[in-house]
């Protein structure tokens, strides 16, 4: 286990002070200032600062991140999607009309991406094609990340992969170990949910370490091939994408890192049956597997978000907003007055908003519920339009959009808000450590070739 440079200096100071017990270096006439009491006092002070430095929480830095951009040959327009659906000879005419209405109102553009096997007529999904999709996305994001940071794969001590619907054997993390020939003691994890919290806790237990998070989803084997309407919406919204994020707890990385993690708030409402079953992978009446979305999904998401914000608010809101909340409680609870629901003004504490691009209806609900502006939701809506719903990696496409627009300034706070089945809601707050200049903002950025076209009006 390595010793951080700051801890090493403190340890060295203690050793020097201990040596003073053998060397009579201090000479004072007053008994109070005799060498022995002075040495004891200095030693106790040093021990205190050493204990403080080793027990306090170490900062977690976001060195950089990278999002995968598939090739143009994988682009799928609305017309291509409908031709694919008809060519598959799996869907009834009513189902195709239903998916047409969903896609036309989805907020997706014509430049999103699909697995190559889904663009053939008929589609040819297989385990081989599913692995091919994951390899393209994961290795594409990782290669870009290692190039941007200059960090070698073998320098990374922790790898975490989160992918909900594709869990092959060997695992996706083992695929990374094999591809980059990682060390035998590397720590690897495969998750089906959001993973920044796990990475942060692992970094607390492993000093002087890099941790890489890979967020992706697999579309090849996830496409629903039946006619149950509750399972057809994911077909219309989900697209190929993935991101890789480099985190560090090394103090020397602060200078070059983009962001510092300030807060993580996780909310899990799985104890409620309504929340637990609102997004569920299961078989339809004919035994065809798909992800069924409840009509109450937006309501469930709003309820989970409310619980999450109750915990997040006290951590980030200014004193003025906290006083407003206390006043609201006094009026509504103590005096039983009919008052409008209290909605915190999160624009007072966050400069940039990266809301999970799960769908147009979800973004509309969050925008209205939190009183956000079109500008605040621009990164999320444009990500949905350009890349579709790429699951948890959409948060990173959104942050990449903000950087591509040269909006990130030193000291800005970024709020990433994610939703997941279960039902879960996670808030992640970052503070920008430096201004991202124009000559850096487009390097390895998936928006590099298209950001000048955005924002666009989405009907």
Swiss-Prot record:
Q: Name one GO biological process term.
A: fatty acid biosynthetic process
Q: What class of enzyme is it?
A: transferase
Q: Cite the EC number.
A: 2.3.1.199
Q: Which reaction does it catalyse?
A: a very-long-chain acyl-CoA + malonyl-CoA + H(+) = a very-long-chain 3-oxoacyl-CoA + CO2 + CoA
The pathway that the record names for this protein is: Lipid metabolism; fatty acid biosynthesis
Q: Which UniProt keywords apply?
A: Acyltransferase, Membrane, Signal, Transferase, Transmembrane, Transmembrane helix
Q: Name one GO molecular function term.
A: fatty acid elongase activity
Residues at the catalytic site: 268, 352, 356, 385, 389
Expression sites (tissue/organ): Expressed in siliques.
Where does the record place the FAE domain?
Answer: 52-334
Protein's cellular compartments: Membrane
Bilayer-spanning residue ranges: 32-52
Does Acyltransferase count among this protein's keywords? Answer: yes
Q: Please give, as recorded in its UniProt entry, the membrane topology of this protein.
A: Single-pass membrane protein
Signal peptide range in chain numbering: 1-25
Q: Which InterPro entries match?
A: 3-ktacl-CoA_syn, ACP_syn_III_C, FAE1_typ3_polyketide_synth, Thiolase-like
Q: How is this protein annotated for GO cellular component?
A: membrane
Instruction: Write out the similarity annotation.
Output: Belongs to the thiolase-like superfamily. Chalcone/stilbene synthases family.
- Protein name as catalogued: Probable 3-ketoacyl-CoA synthase 14
Q: What is the lineage of its organism?
A: Eukaryota, Viridiplantae, Streptophyta, Embryophyta, Tracheophyta
